């Protein structure tokens, strides 16, 4: 009877019954709350913890400090659909992959996943809700809108360090991202000429650790190979590729990708590419049973580079096994994903595209930090994409601002709020200095002029003020005092924010990455303050000097006119 009563408490908490005030990223599909806050008692009765996702159980017990074997206390139900412990909540669990049901009230907490990853995501939501040993009474029914969500380390330049990758994987798990594609362009064992060779022992052990940490955070570690520049379309290289995959499989890798991007020559042949990929799919992926669908990046990976007459994309669409995922960057190398654009590519490849979004990657504008909001992608096309991964900067910690936004967008595009998510990302990454980081990021978000013609908003509030002040000053008119005050405040904040962030000990890897830009930001603020002071001191004399210059010009004209008259008199 007691169990039935407890179940009814959750089941009768109808969705949309209460105003939604709880702040969670990514935004859940459905959430309702009563307004009640529950203080955690410190003693808990666990049910299902021996059957449920072990990584979720471990983190849950770390989160809920106290006695986990109490005879009396807050009841915790945890498990996956089909487990006895959560059977009575089965109807509330979403049917979608990675979906979960979370219910919190003063009698119990229920974390019920459609699968193990769903249970893990229920825990991540619970973790976000916990503040000062209190939880809001809520009922959440949630699932991702896009199947594969995450990051592709696919930029040119200095690859991320091992420590940075470990931090990244934990970050992905916390933000419900399930994919990390390892494909750094400057890894010699990922690409030509060494793709056929096994990793040296040190690098192999590091990859093994990455795979382990990825698994603990419910992230698929996708190892990518880039063989196209020197591959031979023969059985020997087929065997070489499978042998390399076997080596990676032995290291724990269970997800694989083959990249044919940024190459030329014979390796670009779509028929041969399709034959090779199908061979891998049939002789490796399907044989292993525990390997996720194969992913490929085509040579014509954006619309502007495609040749419809050549039939490259339609060949892949016709010949590739249906389970193989095809990556796509959009209308151009660097572009946002539109409804029209996704429809165009899907018609040709005959499957939902797997989006490789080239933001905030900065390997073509390396003097810029791209710390602005994630925006521009259509929010109505989730069902037309099989995956959405972001290509980041070589600055791993700084990339987390955009990665956080992509996590939120790809989980629930229809409820995605770019500005709010951006602010939340900054608070998540550097809570104590969030105000200063937000100010710095607002002035470090655009790429500047570049060959890809891709731009982002930057210094939005400052630009009209600066333009108004400058125009007035150049014309010799009295400038607007409000403009002057706004500029003075901005330059002052630049100097102050730069100084605070440079000495911040909260996120030292982030500060280290941003240090050159922070130093410049601080100096720009200090210089701006000095220039404004000089401009103010000089302003009263501007019109006076202009009048004197005009007078001198008139005198000069008169003198020159008089000289001309004298010359004419002498000639006559």
Mark where each language-model region is:
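Bacterial Sec-dependent N-terminal signal peptides
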Residues: 1-23
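Acidic, contiguous N-terminal accessory segments
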Residues: 17-106, 114, 132-140
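Feature activates predominantly on carbohydrate-active enzymes
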Residues: 89, 94-237, 244, 250-254, ...
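Short, acidic/polar
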Residues: 160-171, 237-247, 312, 338, ...
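Short beta-strand/loop segments at the ligand-binding rim of alpha/beta enzyme cores
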Residues: 218-221, 291-293, 350-355, 538-546, ...
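Catalytic-core regions of glycoside hydrolase
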Residues: 251-254, 263-421
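C-terminal functional modules
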Residues: 418-533, 537
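Glycine- and Gly-Pro-enriched alpha-helical subdomains that act as flexible
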Residues: 529-571
């Amino acid at each position: 009877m007691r169990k039935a009563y407890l179940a009814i408490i959750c089941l009768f908490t109808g969705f949309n019954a209460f105003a939604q005030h709880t702040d969670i990223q990514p935004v859940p599909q459905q959430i309702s709350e009563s307004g009640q806050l529950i203080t955690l008692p410190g003693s808990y009765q666990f049910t299902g913890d021996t059957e449920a996702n072990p990584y979720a159980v471990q983190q849950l017990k770390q989160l809920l400090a106290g006695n986990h074997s109490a005879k009396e206390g807050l009841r915790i139900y945890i498990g996956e659909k089909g487990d006895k412990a959560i059977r009575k909540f089965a109807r509330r669990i979403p049917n979608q992959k990675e979906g979960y049901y979370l219910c919190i009230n003063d009698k119990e907490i229920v974390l019920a996943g459609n699968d193990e990853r769903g249970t893990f995501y229920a825990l991540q939501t619970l973790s976000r809700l916990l503040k000062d040993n209190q939880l809001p009474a809520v009922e959440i029914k949630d699932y991702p809108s896009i199947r594969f969500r995450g990051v592709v380390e696919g930029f040119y330049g200095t690859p991320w360090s091992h420590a940075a990758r470990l931090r990244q994987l934990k970050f992905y798990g916390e933000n419900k991202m399930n994919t990390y594609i390892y494909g750094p362009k400057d890894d010699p064992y990922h690409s030509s000429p060494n793709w056929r060779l096994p990793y040296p022992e040190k690098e192999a052990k590091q990859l093994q650790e990455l795979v382990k940490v990825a698994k603990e955070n419910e992230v698929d570690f996708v190892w990518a190979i880039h063989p196209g520049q020197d591959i031979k379309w023969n059985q020997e290289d087929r065997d070489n590729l499978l042998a390399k995959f076997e080596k990676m499989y032995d290291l724990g890798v269970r997800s694989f990708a083959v990249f044919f991007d940024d190459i030329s020559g014979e390796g670009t042949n779509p028929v041969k590419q399709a034959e090779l990929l199908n061979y891998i799919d049939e002789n490796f992926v399907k044989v292993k049973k525990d390997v996720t669908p194969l992913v490929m990046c085509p040579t014509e990976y954006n619309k502007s580079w495609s040749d419809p007459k050549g039939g490259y994309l339609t060949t892949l669409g016709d010949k590739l096994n249906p389970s193989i995922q095809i990556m796509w960057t959009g209308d151009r190398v660097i572009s946002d994903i539109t409804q029209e654009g996704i429809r165009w590519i899907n018609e040709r490849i005959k499957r939902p595209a797997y989006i490789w979004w080239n933001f905030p990657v900065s390997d073509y504008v390396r003097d810029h930090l791209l710390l602005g909001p994630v925006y521009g992608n259509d929010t109505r096309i989730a069902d037309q994409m099989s995956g959405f991964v972001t290509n980041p900067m070589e600055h791993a910690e700084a990339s987390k601002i955009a990665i956080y936004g992509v996590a939120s967008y790809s989980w629930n595009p229809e409820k995605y709020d770019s500005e709010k998510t951006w602010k939340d990302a900054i608070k998540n990454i550097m809570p104590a200095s969030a105000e200063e980081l937000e100010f710095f990021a607002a002035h470090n978000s655009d790429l500047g002029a570049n060959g890809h013609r891709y731009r982002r908003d930057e210094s939005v509030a400052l630009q009209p003020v600066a333009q108004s002040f400058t125009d007035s000053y150049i014309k010799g008119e009295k400038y607007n005092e409000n403009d002057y005050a706004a500029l003075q405040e901005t330059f002052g904040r630049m100097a102050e924010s730069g100084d605070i962030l440079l000495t911040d000990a909260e996120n030292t890897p982030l500060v280290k990455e941003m240090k050159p830009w922070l130093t410049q930001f601080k100096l720009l603020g200090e210089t701006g303050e000095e220039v404004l002071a000089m401009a103010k001191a000089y302003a009263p004399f501007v019109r006076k000097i202009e009048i004197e210059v005009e007078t001198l010009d008139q005198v000069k004209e008169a003198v020159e006119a008089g000289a001309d008259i004298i010359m004419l008199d002498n000639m006559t």
